Amino acid sequence: MKIRSQVGMVLNLDKCIGCHTCSVTCKNVWTSREGVEYAWFNNVETKPGQGFPTDWENQEKYKGGWIRKINGKLQPRMGNRAMLLGKIFANPHLPGIDDYYQPFDFDYQNLHTAPEGSKSQPIARPRSLITGERMAKIEKGPNWEDDLGGEFDKLAKDKNFDNIQKAMYSQFENTFMMYLPRLCEHCLNPACVATCPSGAIYKREEDGIVLIDQDKCRGWRMCITGCPYKKIYFNWKSGKSEKCIFCYPRIEAGQPTVCSETCVGRIRYLGVLLYDADAIERAASTENEKDLYQRQLDVFLDPNDPKVIEQAIKDGIPLSVIEAAQQSPVYKMAMEWKLALPLHPEYRTLPMVWYVPPLSPIQSAADAGELGSNGILPDVESLRIPVQYLANLLTAGDTKPVLRALKRMLAMRHYKRAETVDGKVDTRALEEVGLTEAQAQEMYRYLAIANYEDRFVVPSSHRELAREAFPEKNGCGFTFGDGCHGSDTKFNLFNSRRIDAIDVTSKTEPHP
């Protein structure tokens, strides 16, 4: 057993209001520069819908993630090394700019410079930020399907409608929607790392964050196809790939990510999970896709177990990280209460950004008397949001974990309602779903109140154990995301070990 630690995230979809504050703040901090205008490290999608980029969940089209071969071994869906090499100069599974959107701005200056006395009112026409040319029509945007925008025929192409009678959901009275914030999953078994020909993508041991070394990246873009969540973007200005860095400078300082800090609905939780690195391959190679969720739970370790603590210390896990893991809200929601579920575990990447399924539309229908009662709790199998849809999204089609999570949240609400409104303690609903009163009270504190100190338990990192920080702090100045350019000479005042980046954006003079 080799114990490693990972900073994970849980998003409570029951409370997401679709305000896109997380997307805007992330955009302003990380991708508000030339080359990545179309890139959104964090975006909020409306489900059902094809998402961003279009139809990203269709792995038959994009070939992302892993597949299990007949001999039980894993292989990138793109193919083995020889197949990857054959596609390196012409990747047929790479999403194009039209699958995202053509980034644009408007000619606002035309409003100021238009001649006076014109017969028509001046307008600001759209202009492409890539080509600089005017666009006749805006065909798509970063959030084109927001709040069920568009006709149902396009929304029905959502892969999560598999095994569902989706025709009935085209009728207005049966319409449903939910918000799905997405970011890099920082997987335990990342397919992007395996598909990078340059070896530029790596997973940090101390916190599990997956990063792209901008000095090693050569812009092959195989990682974009390899990532099943399509959360790696190509910077056309620098010629390198970029992705969500989980705000690692803030994580190292013990602070939450920007998207978590600015979340209006308090839906994001950050915490440490201890896991057995030796069990990753066995878990990801599970034959039945529906068992992948449980196999990933088996990889996680109990931070309160004395044997786990002893082994973690031997493996170099700092005591502050172990203490943070014992207070982790992510561990409570994923392991203790089993409310949080992974996004598309069938991709076999073992994602580390998990989701609590939405309950609000269900509870509203129950209050209105539209659902029959099954004992104390409403019949959650007759929901407005189909359970099978949530299962296709979160548990590879297995409805049992989804039903358990929904029933436990309903039971907690029933218990607290009886306590606060009726002034009595009614534990029948809790007994039905296997919860204690102490667990229900703690769930209420974390889910409903969601104080800052409960949502974010992030220990400051011990980077001093990894390498000398002085050369790294002083040897690299300001950068605009295209790598750290050092001196042209061999002499380096700061004794930094960084390799100078290759300038792929320099323009050469044309031959006469």
Which residues are covered by each model-predicted region?
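Non-ligating segments of multi-cofactor redox enzymes
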Residues: 1-512
